[in-house]
Amino acid sequence: MHTVMPGEIFRKSGLCFFLVLFSFLLPVTVQGVTVDDEITRIQQAYENLQDIKGNFVQKSYIKDLKRTDTFKGQFFIKRPMMLKWCYRGENEQEVFIKNDEIIIYQKKEKQAFKGNFNRETYGQAPIALLSGFGRIREEFSASMKNGKLILKPKKAMGGIVSIELQTSGKGFPIQSFTVIDLLNNRLDMVLSDIQINTGLKESFFSPALPKGVTILEHSS
């Protein structure tokens, strides 16, 4: 049987303490990239961004129902705060955000919901987060985990607990993001075919609702 001497215990525990301390002194890195590097790269890309469009695949996991729903469509953003995204498939709908107003148009039901948009509404309009990632330092606390940038809102943001960003080394710096809310529901958004600064007009973000559509207004 090997007898562990007091000096050996001290050496081992001392080494562990040194390694833990050393890890805290190092900047947070993933493959040589620090949190600050990633944030700087994203915010620099946003400085030159006027508009953006592309495709998305959204997977929403609802914990209580143990169900995952998948949606596909297109999104369009004109900074600072004009958005349009179109869900394709059986239940088509279009969502418009223009500054502090949101309109959700459901084609099949021939109805539209109109309401206010603010920080508390982000959880219901996840693609809108893309318009705000140019202000990461102001809006979020950031860290790195498993190669992803983890963002936690500094102020309440519609029940959002954290956002995981998968960054891209080419073109637009955000490849996908995951939103976790207070109920541990999870929303994954994967972006593709992204084009930037194509000259989207402001009028594109104003819905042209056909006659006969019922408009339901909600004010918070």
Ranges and model annotations:
Residues T3-F18:
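Bacterial N-terminal signal peptides that target proteins for export
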Residues C16-P27:
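Bacterial N-terminal signal peptides
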Residues V30-T34:
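Boundary at the C-terminal end of the N-terminal hydrophobic targeting segment
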Residues V35-D37, R41-I62, K66-T68, I104-V161:
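Flexible, processing/modification-adjacent segments and terminal tails
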Residues L49-D51, T70-K72, P80, E90, ...:
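Extracytoplasmic
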Residues K72-Q124, L187:
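An acidic-aromatic
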Residues R135-S219:
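Gly/Pro-enriched, hydrophobic low-complexity segments
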